[in-house]
Amino acid sequence: MTLAVPVVDLGGFLHGGRAGRLAAAQAFGRAMEEAGFATITGHGVAPALVRDTYRCVREFFAQPEQQKRRHTPPEQTKGRGYLPMKIESVAATLDGRTPPDLCEALVFASLQRERRGVGLPNYWPEEPTELAARINAYFDAMLALARHLMQLSALALALPEDWFAPMYREPSLTLRFVNYPDQEEPPEPGQLRYGAHHDYGGLTILRQDEAPGGLQICDAEDVWHDVPPHPDGFVINVGDLMSRWTNGRWRSTLHRVVNPPRELTGSTQRLSMVAFTGPNGATEVACLPTCADAEHPPRFAPVNAQAYVQSKLAASHALAPAR
């Protein structure tokens, strides 16, 4: 059974007039309210860039474990670098008690700050040789797309189109390339490729491939539904900060990545390319003026964007309880 994730064409928003922009915004807003997820097409990201980045990252994950671990930070946190298998459990952010997730990742964060020579540097593998160029180009494409999505969101929420612009001049944007290897051994009871969780930030941009054992979302009746990949689409979903901004109108939907069926033969390897986007870390996230009134007062206390996300990241590594 499949819960339909709406497909929203951004062509009218990016290339149309006022009517086309509003129509796309309204469709996007409905999807965020009803499902918390949408698949976008007509987004303007070059297919060749996606293919080249995917190929390059897959080559990185094909290297021996010892070679990949050269780019693991000593503390093995989720901030940046190579994250080996089984070092996190995202279900812990919801007080879940599940075995570690069956995935490995390569993470890049705060590239804008790194380019200016400030903040922590990322871990840049030497192989493949073109990886740094591909990652930087993909980051720029995701940054541009994130800003378009926030303009779209502002219109959908009856705000001026540039409402979020000050918070997204240098936003929080983390690229996470996730490899779900073939499962040679059966998972432990309750163990998934990626446990059930909500995303923490603003909007998440996901490119997923065709492989068994994929993304599922949970509906209001606690039933799980597959989210099929789109050949040229990105899956967009609402994170906690965006939901708090909208007073819960936009849903931060529970989701997970399931294991492939054990009876399958052949490779079930899966690679996902994720851009976690959100406002600048100094932003105070409080209810938007168009999302509350006398009958619908603010449901959430204001939070600092960076502090909120960091508490969730720490919990996923069992470093501290989530707030």
Which residues are covered by each model-predicted region?
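Peripheral, non-catalytic segments flanking oxidoreductase cores
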Residues: 1-323
